[in-house]
Amino acid sequence: MRKGILFIISSPSGGGKTTVADFLVGQDLSIKRSISFTTRQPRGEEKDGIDYYFVSKDEFNRLLQEGEMLEHATVLQNQYGTSHRYIEETLALGIDVLCCIDWQGAEQIRKKTNCISIFLLPPSLQKLKTRLTSRGTDTADVIEYRLKVALEEIQHFSKYDYVLVNDDLTETKQKVLSIITAEREKLVQNHRVVECFVASLLEQTI
């Protein structure tokens, strides 16, 4: 059994990473989305333990001090972090894990473990602003702040293994699914399985 692959999807806020991730885990039972810890309040219909683990700042800091975070970041005065234990235990079972995090979190993870990273670029800043506005969860000032942060985030695209322009969401979903499928078939991920299969072929007689 191969070890699972850790996939990272990043994008500016409103860039589509969460929507794409939800599609992937709905299509493929052999991949699970990592649920991040956060100190922010739930938005809309978000549920604890499904969308995020909503914790207090004291609880978050305790987890951080105990080494439970594979990566962490602060965004708009809210803290976010990925569980190190969940990632390792899930990968050990041969199940792939998908993390939706920003470029800073991706940078931290790259320094600690192997991963495949995908960055989603918005087709334009105007379309990104429209997406942020349509969510109806942020004030005008927060949206302007997110757009400024987006300009910083997209400059880090070259650190990623794959970069896609998310102009057509349906097309982007299929492209990311294809990337995951291709990565699973690489020999480095399946060397032992292929080696055993080839050995069995060599033992056969014609």
UniProtKB/Swiss-Prot annotation:
Organism for this UniProt entry: Neorickettsia sennetsu (strain ATCC VR-367 / Miyayama) (Ehrlichia sennetsu)
Reactions it catalyzes: GMP + ATP = GDP + ADP
InterPro entries the record matches: GK/Ca_channel_bsu, Guanylate_kin-like_dom, Guanylate_kinase, Guanylate_kinase_CS, P-loop_NTPase
SUPFAM superfamilies linked to this entry: P-loop containing nucleoside triphosphate hydrolases
Assigned GO CC terms: cytosol
Keyword Nucleotide-binding carried by entry: yes
Transmembrane segments: none
Name listed for the protein in its UniProt record: Guanylate kinase
Similarity remark: Belongs to the guanylate kinase family.
